[in-house]
Amino acid sequence: MSNLCVLFFQFFFLAQFFAEASPLTFELNKGRKECLYTLTPEIDCTISYYFAVQQGESNDFDVNYEIFAPDDKNKPIIERSGERQGEWSFIGQHKGEYAICFYGGKAHDKIVDLDFKYNCERQDDIRNERRKARKAQRNLRDSKTDPLQDSVENSIDTIERQLHVLERNIQYYKSRNTRNHHTVCSTEHRIVMFSIYGILLIIGMSCAQIAILEFIFRESRKHNV
């Protein structure tokens, strides 16, 4: 019974973790700039973002992006060009609205996954709050009086960090797999079109040869007559 409870709590924790970490998917239309925003309630919050271009026509996955701080909406604090995927964290020195803007060029539409969020709590405070929540859910006593429980809590914190790394790796491989699949489909389409053009060219050349031969034989008969 205790093993079933442990498995239940692990499953609940994993489901909650991945539900909170799900990114936003949006369409980046050609020739247009798309901006998304996050509002920080105080200064010195850790702002993090992760994005990956999932689809792009003609193998065009490159986008330009800028990040603007609340104090200056005209001058970006971060600016990158020709990126397919990006991830970074920085300290927001100002309270207010931060914006991340994408531009995919004038040639093709693109599909982008984005995770743009902030965290104003220190990691130690976050771990303590999570531990308190777990204790409240399971009616556990203080871990300071139980070395085994303290060891279990430390193991859970380690699992949380490893899950965060795993989530990022999954997003990276998902993006790479999507781009590779799109590249394969695009290459397959080009091969099919090239084959069709080749067949039509052969048929056209055969018809032209037949017409030329008929014209030559017709002219030779006229001369013989």
UniProtKB/Swiss-Prot annotation:
Residue intervals on the Lumenal side: 24-195
Annotated stretches, region: Disordered: 129-149
Ranges of residues in domain GOLD: 33-172
Organism: Saccharomyces cerevisiae (strain ATCC 204508 / S288c)
Primary gene name: ERP3
Pfam families given in the database record: EMP24_GP25L
GO BP of this protein: endoplasmic reticulum to Golgi vesicle-mediated transport; Golgi organization; intracellular protein transport; protein retention in ER lumen; vesicle-mediated transport
The protein's name in its UniProt record: Protein ERP3
Further comment found in the protein's record: Present with 3190 molecules/cell in log phase SD medium.
Cytoplasmic side: 217-225
Compartment annotation: Endoplasmic reticulum membrane
UniProt biased composition (Basic residues): 129-138
Signal peptide limits: 1-23
Any Gene Ontology CC annotation: Golgi apparatus
Keywords: Endoplasmic reticulum, ER-Golgi transport, Membrane, Protein transport, Signal, Transmembrane, Transmembrane helix, Transport
Record membrane topology: Single-pass type I membrane protein
InterPro entries named in the record: Emp24-like (IPR015720), GOLD_dom (IPR009038)
Function: Involved in vesicular protein trafficking.
Family (UniProt): Belongs to the EMP24/GP25L family.
TM segment ranges: 196-216
